[in-house]
A protein has these predicted regions:
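Catalytic adenosine-cofactor/nucleotide-binding cores of aminoacyl-tRNA synthetases and other
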Residues: 291, 296, 303, 318-470, ...
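Residue-level signal for inorganic ion chemistry
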Residues: 46, 158, 346, 548
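A structural motif corresponding to the C-terminal end of an alpha-helix
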Residues: 66-68, 125-138
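N-terminal catalytic cores of NTP/NDP-binding nucleotidyl/phosphoryl-transfer enzymes
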Residues: 2-90, 272-291
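A glycine-rich helix N-cap at a beta->alpha junction
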Residues: 93-116, 129, 133
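Basic, alpha-helical terminal appendages of large translation-related enzymes
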Residues: 1-32, 44-45, 71-73, 174, ...
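Active-site cores that bind ATP or allylic diphosphates and position pyrophosphate for catalysis
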Residues: 109, 135-338
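Charged, often glycine-rich, active-site loop that binds/positions anionic groups
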Residues: 79-97, 154-155, 326-333
Length: 582
């Protein structure tokens, strides 16, 4: 087992680990420490939901690094009701509306899916992503827990104590009415919308808290005829546990709750029940669960008063956005998921984005050009960690990103800048022979022997280029010289091209071509190679670069010129940049 030393004061993960270890020793000395997450497979499980997993994962992993036994539970809330038909999900249509109100495990999967039901269809890609990310966890299906009677005693207890539960809930109902439903802090328009949307993907979304005309009942049966939760409890006998309910479909039934396994506790009672049942010490919650009267706040009262447990240490986590897009909602189809992110970036980079920010800090994950800057920052951090110049917090985040207590995650053997790889596969359109030729020329002192050395980063860059870069932003090298533009060149432009072409062979590497393209304008201005940039020199370089881009790709901008020149190749560069003889 690889255990990487991290300063105990280095970062937010270490501080939470300290707190959790101390709290576990107070509550349950000698027992495994329990951290928990909850995910509802009501639709695509987006990158905001991933924070629900990564926050306790990182804390649990730090606890394991210190030699403590720690289990990370992930509860699949697959017994939640199907609330609405999400937009943008392939393989479904308006007919899925007939399943609204059923447990997610009773809803058919989208057409063409190989999975048995809706919940399994949306769990599967998340399970695969968690494996790639190195997340070690113990899964719990809430469908299995409820339908096999695991929570029977807790359900009967909640029904016996329904008056006390109702009194606790009523305190918060009163507070909310008095406060006018105010939310803590100030949210901008985007954050407010995101808060409402996030609730749709949680167990708290759109459900009543158990109030009925006949009284308060914290248990909601699923109808035995239509399988939906459009039911109302109308009577309950504590002695016999006989429960009477009616359903909107017209069915009415009496069941014995000591035997009945087709229903669940309402969310604000279900969550604290699970805290006590599992002995959870640490579980974060989103903003939608942390406002006055929310499930986390109410649960903190119920877990002790009703179920004899204690509320977990529970930091609120902020939203995760997408670069260039509004924040996400799992109730809406088409939102980026962990699988989408891992399609274009390596697992350590995605882990790093969650590890480097405190849970209450928002951040964005880039699917646009910003991903190139993120990769530059990541590679720079790796070099700083290697030479010992990284700050303790940055070094800790890097360590948590590249591995876990169980070992290091797979890495690309021959690391090259993501933006360089993206530019190369953009120009070569993925042709492996051309790509390898260019990669071999990048650095003659450390040549790439095979494409496998640059994988998986090369493959991630290629998928980003082909799936996230608009067609009008792709690089298309001209098929032949722009004879009209070449004929219009002035003597200064012709001389600058002559100097560039004359230096190609001597400078044919990424570093050499960088020196060459920046050096030609210096020569034209009569300046020494090591001169500091001046406004005049910068202007001359911009004009020279624009000329090269126009003659190579027909635009004024493009990928970095040294990379572009390598990708085009010396022979074709000469063809495109050589004016016809006068």
């Amino acid at each position: 087992m690889l255990v990487v030393a991290v300063s105990p004061e280095a970062d937010w993960v270490s501080r939470f680990a300290d707190e959790v270890i101390a709290e576990a020793e107070r509550r349950a000395p000698g027992k495994p420490i329990v951290c928990a997450s909850g995910l509802s497979p009501s639709g695509p499980i987006h990158l905001g939901n991933l924070r629900e997993v990564m926050t306790p994962h990182l804390v649990a992993d730090e606890i394991r690094r210190r030699g403590h036994e720690c289990v990370h539970l992930i509860s699949w809330d697959d017994y939640d009701r199907f609330r609405k038909v999400p937009a943008g999900v392939p393989g479904i249509d308006e007919t899925w509306a007939q399943h609204i109100g059923k447990p997610l495990t009773s809803v058919p999967a989208p057409a063409g899916s190989r999975y048995a039901n809706w919940a399994e269809h949306f769990k599967a890609p998340m399970i695969e992503s968690l494996a790639q990310l190195g997340v070690e966890y113990h899964p719990i299906s809430q469908t299995e827990q409820y339908t096999t009677g695991k929570y029977r005693e807790q359900i009967l207890l909640a029904m016996r104590e329904r008056a006390r539960i109702d009194a606790v809930l009523d305190r918060y109902r009163t507070k909310n009415r008095t406060a006018g439903g105010a939310q803590p802090g100030k949210l901008d328009e985007e954050e407010a919308a995101a808060a409402a949307e996030a609730a749709e993907g949680s167990g708290a979304a759109g459900e009543d808290d158990g109030n009925t005309v006949a009284g308060y009942f914290p248990y909601k049966p699923y109808c035995s005829v239509c399988d939906r939760d459009l039911t109302t409890v109308v009577a309950y006998d504590d002695e016999t546990t006989e429960l009477d309910y009616t359903c909107a479909c017209g069915h009415a039934e009496q069941v014995r709750l000591s035997e009945h396994n087709r229903g669940k506790l309402v969310w604000k009672v279900d969550w604290p029940m699970r805290w006590a049942y599992e002995g959870v010490i640490f579980e974060p919650s989103g903003v939608d669960h942390s406002s006055p009267g929310s499930s986390f706040q109410v649960g903190g009262q119920l877990v002790g008063e009703i179920f004899g447990g204690e509320q977990p240490i529970g930091p609120m986590y902020a939203f995760v956005g997408i670069s260039g897009m509004a924040k996400m909602s799992s109730s809406r189809g088409g939102v980026p998921t962990a699988a989408d992110a891992l399609d274009i970036m390596e697992p350590p980079l995605l882990r790093w984005l969650y590890a480097r920010r405190r849970p209450n800090q928002s951040f964005k994950i880039a699917f646009d050009q910003e991903i190139q800057r993120l990769y530059d920052e990541w590679d720079t951090l790796g070099r700083k960690v290697g030479d010992g110049t990284a700050t303790p917090a940055d070094a800790a985040a890097y360590t948590r990103a590249v591995g876990t207590a169980a070992g290091l995650l797979p890495v690309t053997p021959h690391v090259l800048p993501y933006r360089t790889l993206a530019s190369i596969v953009d120009v070569t359109t993925g042709d492996e022979a051309q790509t390898l030729r260019i990669l071999r020329d990048l650095d003659p002192a450390d040549p790439v022997a095979s494409l496998d050395e640059t994988r998986p980063r090369l493959d991630k860059a290629q998928r980003w280029i082909t799936t996230h870069v608009p067609a009008d932003q792709r690089t298309r090298v001209l098929a032949g010289p722009d004879t009209a533009r070449l004929a219009e060149l002035g003597e200064t432009e012709r001389e600058s091209l002559r100097l560039l072409l004359a230096g190609l062979d001597e400078h044919w590497s990424l570093e050499g071509l960088t020196t060459l393209v920046y050096g030609v304008p210096k020569v034209m201005l009569g300046l020494p190679p090591d001169v500091k940039p001046t406004p005049e020199l910068k202007t001359a370089q911009r004009e020279f670069f624009a000329l090269l881009y126009h003659l190579l790709v027909g635009r004024d901008t493009g990928p970095r010129l040294p990379t572009l020149l390598l990708a085009v190749g010396p022979d074709r560069v000469r063809t495109l940049l050589t004016p016809a003889a006068a």
